[in-house]
């Protein structure tokens, strides 16, 4: 077991919150390093997100009520952080970034099992940083920033080449 702090409607580890599933089509919120020594995973702190209740009809005479965190426009979103888990050391480390990104819609390991790429975005989703984070030194650098007047579309086409370049 990698984490022990998960709690319904408070902390989610390695799975997505409602916003990430709907906005970014992200369900599995972890990635194994190519050498199998590390896992990078998302931690969603939903504790400040307001709850929403919905009636579910499951075949009975009366509905059951499901209560879950559901941020409406302009309200608090989950605070998202990325962690490295080192299997040999049995230790998780928070990946420090220069900015507190509102969204981190994608993570992907490079061919180097110590380097993780991540996309960091602002709330309006019109500014994206492409960041490389080092699992061993817990340092990172922004390789480039993309800005748009309206919206930046997220894709899964990032491919790392053997020489650490990418397309």
Give names to the regions the model predicted.
Residues 2-30, 41-94:
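Predominantly five- to eight-bladed beta-propeller fold
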Residues 9, 73-75, 145-158, 162:
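Beta-propeller and related beta-repeat scaffolds in trafficking/envelope systems
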Residues 20-22, 96-100, 144-150:
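Surface loop/turn motifs at the tips and blade-to-blade linkers of beta-strand repeat domains
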Residues 24, 29-38, 106-116, 157-166:
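Blade-terminus and WD-like Trp-Asp/Gly-His loop motifs, strongest in beta-propeller folds
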Residues 26-28, 78, 103-105, 126, ...:
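Beta-rich catalytic cores
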Residues 46-49, 122-126:
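Short glycine/acidic-enriched loop and turn motifs that connect beta-strands
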Residues 80-87, 130-138:
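Beta-propeller blade signature
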Residues 86-122, 136:
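Long hydrophobic segments that form regular secondary structure
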């Amino acid at each position: 077991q990698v984490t022990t702090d998960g709690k319904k409607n408070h902390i989610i580890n390695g799975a997505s919150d409602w916003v990430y599933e709907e906005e970014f089509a992200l369900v599995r919120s972890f990635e194994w390093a190519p050498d199998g020594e590390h896992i990078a995973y998302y931690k969603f702190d939903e504790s400040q997100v307001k709850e929403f209740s919905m009636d579910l009809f499951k075949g009975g005479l009366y509905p059951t009520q499901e209560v879950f965190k559901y941020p409406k426009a302009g309200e608090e979103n989950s605070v998202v952080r990325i962690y490295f888990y080192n299997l040999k050391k049995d230790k998780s480390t928070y990946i420090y970034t220069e900015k507190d990104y509102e969204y981190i819609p994608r993570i992907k390991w490079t061919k180097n099992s110590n380097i993780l790429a991540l996309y960091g975005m602002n709330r309006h989703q019109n500014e994206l940083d492409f960041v490389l984070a080092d699992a061993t030194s817990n340092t990172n650098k922004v390789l480039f920033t993309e800005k748009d007047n309206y919206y930046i579309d997220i894709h899964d086409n990032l491919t790392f080449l053997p020489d650490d370049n990418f397309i």
